[in-house]
Curated annotation (Swiss-Prot):
InterPro entries: HDAC_PDAC, His_deacetylse, His_deacetylse_1, His_deacetylse_dom, His_deacetylse_dom_sf, Ureohydrolase_dom_sf. Highly expressed in leaves, stems, flowers and young siliques. Residues 422-457, 479-488 have a biased composition (Basic and acidic residues). Loss-of-function mutant (antisense inhibition) has an increased level of tetraacetylated histone H4 and shows late flowering, developmental pleiotropy and increased symptoms when infected by a pathogen. Zn(2+) binds at D184, H186, D272. The keyword Glycosyltransferase does not apply. It comes from Arabidopsis thaliana. Binds 1 zinc ion per subunit. One of its GO terms (cellular component) is nucleus. The record marks Y311 as: Polarizes the scissile carbonyl of the substrate. This is Histone deacetylase 19. Belongs to the histone deacetylase family. HD type 1 subfamily.
Amino acid sequence: MDTGGNSLASGPDGVKRKVCYFYDPEVGNYYYGQGHPMKPHRIRMTHALLAHYGLLQHMQVLKPFPARDRDLCRFHADDYVSFLRSITPETQQDQIRQLKRFNVGEDCPVFDGLYSFCQTYAGGSVGGSVKLNHGLCDIAINWAGGLHHAKKCEASGFCYVNDIVLAILELLKQHERVLYVDIDIHHGDGVEEAFYATDRVMTVSFHKFGDYFPGTGHIQDIGYGSGKYYSLNVPLDDGIDDESYHLLFKPIMGKVMEIFRPGAVVLQCGADSLSGDRLGCFNLSIKGHAECVKFMRSFNVPLLLLGGGGYTIRNVARCWCYETGVALGVEVEDKMPEHEYYEYFGPDYTLHVAPSNMENKNSRQMLEEIRNDLLHNLSKLQHAPSVPFQERPPDTETPEVDEDQEDGDKRWDPDSDMDVDDDRKPIPSRVKREAVEPDTKDKDGLKGIMERGKGCEVEVDESGSTKVTGVNPVGVEEASVKMEEEGTNKGGAEQAFPPKT
């Protein structure tokens, strides 16, 4: 395989990309609890595939700097962050009122190392934004991120801290406009809610709509005030396949890119929209899912790739490995190399899994109506919004560890985490693990449909600074330390937004 340093030739556009990949070896150790479908171990499985396919050698591999309290409080309420920092399995019985207040308990359980987990995945997403802002990479990847349901004042849908909102706020320091695209099967409600009233962030969510968590994302939810028409929702039904999905995705996203002209794109790649997902009901193949990544990559705009949902974890690892290859411009072989988790992928031991023969309930007429309605809404946006020339806010401090000095294929330690999947027996470890559980499907999506949080918004001013409004509003503390990169300050914290051309 011919490399180009950290940058490989892409597909049809022929343009090279430099890719930064954020990974913390300890992220797979966190454990939501017995029977819970969210398994951070899937991130370690993904990393193992990347190592054995040789993809780590073609990226800059970085260990994220943990997000600090003040970083998280750029969006989240300070008392909520304080609660996450202090709560433990041993003390939770003494904080019943707080657990209810912040919606922590069942879907979002308290577990050992909860706050460190939040700091880790949020740090990777914010770190990716900083790298993109400084032009140090073209694509940044954090598969541990993408937890799109978390609200300002509460946890929701397995998500505690909304790393996506934090990453977008960081990107807004450099870019006038940021586009958020969500291909998770669940509506990206937390991100939409945060930016519902601003025209500097456009949110586009392709999701299952109906009696399904979180119950939001109607096609008529289009934004409010200056954000009107800057929220796009694409409601889909069970069984949508690759062809049907891209009848909507490509024309809609093509028009969005033409009209909105974002300076950066954040793509949440939730893998629960794949065929056969434990909590999902779509019928996308891995190649069909990855086609969305390939399409957004083709616009040559700084791109942040994040994870998200995905509960048949062997397929999650397959998907994100393949999509890492797409980001690099490498066609990853279907035949899987032998590695620590090889037995999980039997009996075929291949990267790709055939879609099922489930019924596609999305008729051609329905898809055309959705496409026409959304294109009509986009036609009401005459031009991309701009902001006045302003001083650029300082960068968030992200002194991540560059691991490129080591052999990329040997960076992962298979002994530091449990070898457990939906259908595997646990191996003893320093982290308590659950027993084997069946790979059953939950037709309602996530366990326990919860009422959507109301009244919390992020107001973004022209400089990229933010103010959170709603329940228990708090002041926003900006990070004040400039990022030092290889002994020099690249990009300069004093840079201002360029004037609109």
